[in-house]
């Protein structure tokens, strides 16, 4: 009986921890694992992330409701190995981990910037698949 209760407690702990996989990640690959699990929940047909889709997402310019076209490369530059500039003229460190090894090492920062930038560019939250494709692309940049 006691073993059964312990097993249930362990199972409950795993179930409760599942949604916060992204919050506990320490590397880009761990972030991708968390986003993959989330993408599979959001979209049962999900199979894997695509660097090609991520590159397309990064380079795309999208018209916003105010008529202004916005895209990642608008501030981050066409080359994610290069430093970018915000609209307020502040420096942005390179997005590609090959040029900025600290990129994607702090899950809270990753989510903070996806939150801000997705809402600014897309006028909505990014999906887990979009986030994963985006990171897969940036990891592929050499």
Segments and roles (model prediction):
Residues 29-66:
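Electrostatic cytochrome c docking/interface patches
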Residues 93-108:
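Short microdomains enriched in Cys/His and/or Lys/Arg
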Residues 1-12:
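Bacterial N-terminal signal peptides that target proteins for export
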Residues 10-20:
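Bacterial N-terminal signal peptides
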Residues 84-91:
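Short cysteine/histidine-rich zinc-coordinating motifs and their immediately flanking basic loops
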């Amino acid at each position: 009986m006691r073993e059964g209760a312990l097993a249930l407690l362990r199972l409950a702990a795993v179930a409760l921890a599942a949604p916060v996989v992204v919050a506990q990640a320490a590397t880009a690959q761990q972030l991708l694992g968390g986003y993959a699990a989330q993408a599979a929940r959001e979209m049962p047909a999900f199979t894997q992330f695509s660097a090609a889709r991520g590159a397309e997402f990064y380079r795309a310019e999208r018209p916003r409701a105010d008529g202004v076209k916005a895209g990642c490369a608008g501030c981050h530059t066409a080359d994610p190995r290069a430093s970018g500039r915000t609209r307020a003229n502040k420096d942005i460190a390179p997005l590609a981990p090959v040029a900025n090894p600290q990129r994607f090492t702090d899950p809270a920062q990753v989510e903070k910037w996806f939150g801000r930038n997705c809402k600014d560019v897309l006028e909505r939250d990014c999906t887990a698949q979009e986030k994963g494709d985006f990171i897969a692309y940036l990891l592929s940049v050499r």
